[in-house]
């Protein structure tokens, strides 16, 4: 299986971007704390419940799904570096080089974080995403996802399930 490598927003394509889809480290734990050890690799942007992810595990309520990878910022200098997530199901916190840069709630909406201040220049940078998906518990929109699929209901899908990418943009941008 190959990750989605194309630019995710063709109508707004910028030259200075870096697609972060591909293998990431992952762990499923009972804690929001960064794990000491990783369970293996997951292919982003596929949910861990999906065979294409290489994991094939269902995230249970109360569990945390952690993602980690290293990256270099997009080529160029100046401006701002934005980290885009096409979608993460359901709630997440994002750290760059050990600094919390933001988070998001809602499994179907894209979000963007400005990570410029947390970057280590042009070198190696660490990205950690902690996700929790309370499928079957809580009031979040979930469509037909369930932990007990059958009939018209299908298995829950959690975590990063849309493209993740970086862009270098001018200081003033749309």
Describe the function of each predicted region.
Residues 43-47, 137-140:
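Short amphipathic alpha-helical segments, especially helix-boundary/capping motifs
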Residues 49-56:
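N-terminal glycine-rich cofactor-binding segment
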Residues 20-45:
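Predominantly extracellular/luminal regions of secreted and cell-surface proteins
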Residues 3-11, 16, 25-30, 57, ...:
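Accessory beta-strand-rich segments of carbohydrate-active enzymes
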């Amino acid at each position: 299986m190959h990750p989605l490598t194309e630019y995710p927003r063709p109508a707004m394509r910028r030259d200075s971007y870096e697609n972060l889809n591909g293998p990431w480290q992952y762990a499923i734990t009972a804690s929001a704390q960064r794990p000491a050890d990783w369970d293996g690799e997951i292919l982003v942007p596929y949910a861990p419940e999906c065979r294409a992810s290489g994991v094939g595990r269902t995230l249970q309520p109360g569990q945390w799904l952690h993602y980690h990878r290293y990256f270099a910022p997009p080529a160029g200098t100046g401006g701002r570096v934005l980290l885009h997530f096409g979608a993460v199901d359901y709630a997440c916190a994002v750290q760059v080089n050990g600094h919390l840069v933001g988070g998001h709630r809602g499994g179907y909406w894209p979000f963007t974080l400005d990570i410029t201040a947390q970057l280590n220049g042009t070198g190696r940078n660490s990205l950690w995403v902690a996700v929790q998906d309370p499928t079957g518990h809580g009031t979040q929109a979930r469509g037909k996802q369930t932990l007990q699929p059958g009939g018209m209901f299908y298995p829950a899908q959690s975590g990063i399930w849309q493209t993740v990418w970086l862009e270098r943009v001018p200081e003033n941008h749309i």
